[in-house]
């Protein structure tokens, strides 16, 4: 999957993600400009397949919620993700009127349904207008399909963050 040079403006409603990645392999997202009413770029794990080998680079990801998010739907695993050379943070205008020029977090990693996030590298990013530049959450929120065993607490493994700058 190759997404290159797209513009997404989905701020009209509070629950609009910009780009969702669920159960995909060999993904490249580059040179994109996303502004969303919810998460700008979100990895989800509802699919039977794991998400693997993802590159996000040279993108502008702005949100009324989380600019870059893994979760909260994390029944699957996420491996080998590189995010580099991006600007992320809060949108200038929140149409809901609930927030002023700010996202909840720049990067949110929320493993709450038993999944694992591993080999995740973030480098050379700028975070603007975020209440929390990074938000990490490990939990078992008790989300179980009928007949399935209770999942364990989620796992973060080999997470690396380097060369992060703060903006306004």
List each model region and its residues:
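Extracellular/periplasmic carbohydrate-active domains that bind, remodel
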Residues: 1-168
């Amino acid at each position: 999957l190759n997404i290159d040079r797209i513009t997404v403006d989905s701020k009209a409603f509070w629950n609009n993600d910009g780009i969702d990645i669920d159960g995909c392999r060999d993904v490249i997202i580059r040179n994109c400009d996303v502004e969303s009413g919810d998460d700008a770029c979100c990895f989800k794990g509802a699919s039977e397949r794991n998400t693997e080998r993802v590159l996000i680079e040279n993108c502008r990801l702005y949100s009324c919620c989380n600019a870059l998010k893994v979760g909260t739907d994390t029944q699957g695993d996420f491996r080998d993700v590189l995010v580099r050379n991006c600007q992320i943070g809060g949108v200038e205008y929140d149409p809901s009127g609930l927030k002023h020029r700010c996202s909840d977090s720049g990067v949110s990693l929320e493993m709450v349904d038993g999944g694992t996030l591993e080999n995740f590298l973030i480098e050379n990013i700028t975070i603007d207008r975020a209440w929390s530049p990074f938000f990490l959450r490990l939990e078992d929120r008790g989300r179980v399909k009928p007949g399935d065993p209770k999942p364990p607490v989620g796992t973060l493994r080999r997470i690396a963050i380097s060369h992060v700058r703060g903006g306004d």
